[in-house]
Amino acid sequence: IFDRKELLGDYSRAFFSDSTAFYHNRLSGFLGHYKSTERENTYVEMAIDWEGMYSEQSREMFRIISAGRYTLERGFYFGYAFSMFHFAGSKLNENVTDNLLVNPYVGWGFNAYFDFDIKAGFLFAPQRGRSVDHNWKKPCGAQIDFVLTKWGVKLENNLYLGENLQPLRNIAVGEDIPVTYGQDGLYAGEPFYATTKNVYNRTWVGYDRRFFKGTLAVEAGMVFHYDGTGMGTQQVVKLSVDIQKLFNIGPKAKK
């Protein structure tokens, strides 16, 4: 079992929503990664998260995730993120669903009084609900991310343009089961990526900073969502303390 914050990868919220990252903050399985000592922000990782065991009520579920990034000169970089979710059945509902998501991207991080990070990527989400049909659905789209920070003050904008990445969200998991795939837990990403208007924009404005070598983290801000049909807002206030660092426990880094 390991903490989600140990993941190095840059995963779009199409992979994991804020609520998924908060409530499902422990991963059960395997994590392995390599981080370059010669190039900053250069790494590759792979993890397996066993999310559910087969039983009378619960599904057998596991997720394979991987990410990598290579940083070039002057802040340019390229990388990828990948997820394969095996969403199998329970004794009461034997249908199996395959759900994949691939996100190659390129970006540029630089400083011009403010710290900037601009990234553009492609999202491809092949998936198949075997209880629905045996045809693969292959929605895709593009995402552009922009981040500006200074002294902890942060402006972040994520713009997605493309097809509905969660086409099974509102479909019932079985003929006699009044539960949709969205309710049953097939999608871990933000539900806004199920947009039917080919657009989703998320803007975050606020304060996000860590103190005492990462022991204390403070985050507060406003989030604005737009999916082509209307706008919604969220307020975020979060204070977190790393107990492991506070009491100097757990594995120590080798020097």
Predicted regions and their residues:
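Exposed, low-structure sequence patches enriched in small/polar residues
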Residues: 41-47, 51, 57, 65-72, ...
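Surface-exposed coil loops of outer-membrane beta-barrel proteins
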Residues: 1-69, 81-86
